[in-house]
Every structure is written in structure tokens, then in C-alpha cells.
Amino acid sequence: MMYPYMTFEDGTEVVHSDLIVDGDIEKVIVHFERPTAEGFDSARCELPSYNWTMWEGRFTDEEKRGFETFLSNNAHLLYRYAANGGAKVA
């Protein structure tokens, strides 16, 4: 299951998975998606390795660096929310 986390000013949606246990590693999948005239720009990153598993559309290298900074700054919260079934928002 994927849970909403944040929407950036340009319309990019950030969602994350449940906590995934793979052997002795706890993982979270984070997906970035932005609507375009042709469909979507999409990127997916796996934490804690910061491995990009999908990159489609027209996100720029600068945006990718921004996503990596965002992930680094938010990883602790993404893990917390993933373990608890998403952020609880009223």
C-alpha cells in the first residue's frame, strides 16, 4: 500500500510504502509523480540504499538532486510513517 506524504509546489506528489522487511533490512519505497500533458513524470527510490528503481519522464538532474536531499532530510519521518500505516492527518 502507498500513503500520501507531501505535494510540492510544482504538483509533484510524494507517496511512500508500508515498511518492508527484507531479511534483516527495513525498507521504504518512495514514489515521486508529477502530471504532464503527456501523462506523468515518475521516479521511485528505495530507502535505505537510496537506489533509484524507476525514472520515467522529464524530471531533471537538478530535480533528482533535490529529491535526494529531500529523502535524506525526511527519511526518519518516512520510516516512522511507513511503520505506522501512513501519517495520521485530520
Predicted segment positions?
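Intrinsically disordered, low-complexity segments enriched in polar/charged residues with Gly/Pro
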Residues: 5-6, 31-32, 65
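A short, structured beta-strand/loop element
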Residues: 16-59
